[in-house]
Amino acid sequence: MIVRTNVKYCANGFDLLLMIPDNTIKTSFFDPQYRGVLDKLNYGNEGKRRGKQRCDLPQMSEETIIGFVRELNRVTVKSGHMFLWVDKFHLCTGIDKWIENTDFNIVDMIVWDKGKMGMGYRSRRRSEYLIVLQKSPVRAKGCWTDHGIPDVWFEKVVKKHPHSKPVELQKRLITATTEPNDVVLDPAAGGFSVYDSCIETGRLFLGCDLVFGDEKLKEKSGDFLCAA
């Protein structure tokens, strides 16, 4: 099986993860398509006007999310990082079950202020949350080089995808935890904002999305290859 970096693959993230050897990735991003908050709010017009684009995307069960996290744990190097996007609902209810039986530790969190309000019965959602996970052993020296990143980050984005993410924040996190030409992994890439962040920082993107993407994963004879 051969896979190339800096390609927007249209594929199941599990298929891509199974191609990656153990302990090879320094930094990954994971933005699961969960529906916990939608089930909680239970809007009657879900899938019509409100959030139609989001509702049309394939939803991940909790078991699927746990499966992704365990595979990401397997491929991450010791003291490597995984950046996990969550909303307020999952932040409050906790992600302990997601990282159970892995070597991931919660070491930090960044609040992304999107600059516009979303849904909510009481307070309106304006933020998303990026949980910073580090694989054991936990350490900052030599693993995190940018100490100027604030824990509340304001960045407006042009919405090209229901889950558009802040490229400038991702760029700072990528450069803080990797070196030029290192591989950055995103197995549920959505609008491929991590791809853009990698290209702009001189890193190699390895990722896919089940719906979006330009190229299918192809089986070929040969060893796993990660090349631009």
Place the predicted regions along the sequence by residue:
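Conserved Class I SAM-dependent methyltransferase catalytic core
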Residues: 58-115
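SAM-dependent nucleic-acid methyltransferase catalytic core
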Residues: 1-35, 180, 200
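Glycine-rich helix-loop-beta junction characteristic of Rossmann-like nucleotide cofactor-binding loops
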Residues: 19-21, 74-75, 173-179
